[in-house]
Amino acid sequence: MIEIITEADYKDRLAAMQNGVLLFFKKLCPHCKNMEKVLEKFGAAKPGIALYGIDIEENAAAAAALGAERPPTIFVIKGGEAKASKVGLMNPREMAAFFEKA
């Protein structure tokens, strides 16, 4: 399940995250909704990976700090750092490959 975080706690969450995914989304974005479903499937297949989401409109400073310009933007977090990012929709197989490659 994707846990929603905010600007107030995203830095602490990222710093503590060993393996995870951060999704910048917009509430009315259809591609974001689809990407949420992909991440839910991805998370079910890889239970040790943390899944976080952050609203890009309500948390613009966090988006700017990480370089997320438009939703959906996905960041792979390993060892507390963003190792890779991608904008747009992926299927579960692409998401798994993207995570492993980062």
Language-model segments: which ranges?
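Non-catalytic, surface beta->alpha helical segment in thiol-disulfide oxidoreductase systems
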Residues: 75-102
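Structural micro-motif
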Residues: 66-75
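N-terminal "domain-start" segment that seeds a small globular fold
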Residues: 1-12
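Typically the conserved alpha-helix immediately C-terminal to a functionally engaged Cys/Sec
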Residues: 33-45
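CheY-like receiver
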Residues: 12-13, 62-66, 98
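Thiol-based oxidoreductase modules, predominantly thioredoxin-like and allied folds used
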Residues: 4-6, 24, 43, 47-61
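The canonical Cys-X-X-Cys-His
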Residues: 29-32, 74
